[in-house]
């Protein structure tokens, strides 16, 4: 099985390829340069792996939340690639991707993900990983004021690992929560960490056709234009 993953939802730009268990990945910090960097990165990964788009089984994309512009760029490019090669698509949460990153780096199984959402809010989620490697908690994804995050944290207990830029943007976020918090050493999502999630979704048949691939902004006032003729 071969899955190509692309993410441009934050300041980072990343591409990764799952090739029957072998992972090739490229990660760059390139604010405002996503459109210039992402396609060369895709081509580099494919060339290095001796793979073409027609060899791929599915294309995973970072569906958000994150920068509105970044999410749009990522899904637009992913749709273009998938359309040309007639590939199904898999939308992967950027928040869950960071949780997977914390597990890869330090074995975290209980993760609090927070991305700075600007406008005095954070993109938030609480994840727990089961013994089969499946992450649970997608239903907790939301855009929240820090004080609401604090209320959510007070309903939890024990030790949790923190990931994302939200903890830097709001350094008091976890104070007086009653939780034991450890830094997961993951600030931004990476396509490499999308792959295990995407592989599981692919195995479960959770793919969508190109015209049905959509972002998840978590803010309801952002419109998304589908591909022409696919309304």
From Swiss-Prot:
It comes from the Bacteria. Keywords: Cytoplasm, tRNA processing. The keyword Hydrolase does not apply. Pfam families: TsaD (PF00814). One of its GO terms (cellular component) is EKC/KEOPS complex. SUPFAM superfamilies: Actin-like ATPase domain. Required for the formation of a threonylcarbamoyl group on adenosine at position 37 (t(6)A37) in tRNAs that read codons beginning with adenine. Is probably involved in the transfer of the threonylcarbamoyl moiety of threonylcarbamoyl-AMP (TC-AMP) to the N6 group of A37, together with TsaD and TsaE. TsaB seems to play an indirect role in the t(6)A biosynthesis pathway, possibly in regulating the core enzymatic function of TsaD. Belongs to the KAE1 / TsaD family. TsaB subfamily. NCBIfam families: T6A_YeaZ. TsaBCDE are necessary and sufficient for tRNA(NNU) t(6)A37 threonylcarbamoyladenosine modification in vitro in E.coli. This is tRNA threonylcarbamoyladenosine biosynthesis protein TsaB. It comes from Escherichia coli (strain K12).
